[in-house]
Amino acid sequence: MPASVDLEKETVITGRVVDRDGQAVGGAFVRLLDSSDEFTAEVVASATGDFRFFAAPGSWTLRALSAAGNGDAVVTPSGAGIHEVDVKIT
């Protein structure tokens, strides 16, 4: 996490994209969708499947798209801090 990030004020959603065996899936596109399924942001997962978004508290859907498959996960951060969630693709 960058030193300039104030975890007492920032809401960070972070995690990994994994396959059905729990192995990391690098290079997947990870989309952040709001509570009405509207596209908000997209990042490319690192070679180790890691991703990170800065978001507001609320309900979010993470959607991973890759050649190995697709998957969704829901996270509902209630406040500032790091909120971890893995997205499993099938």
State each model region's role.
Residues 7, 47, 56-58, 79:
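Surface-exposed loops/turns
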Residues 28-32, 62:
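Hydrophobic beta-strand segments
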Residues 67-90:
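Structured interaction patches on ligand/partner-binding surfaces of diverse proteins
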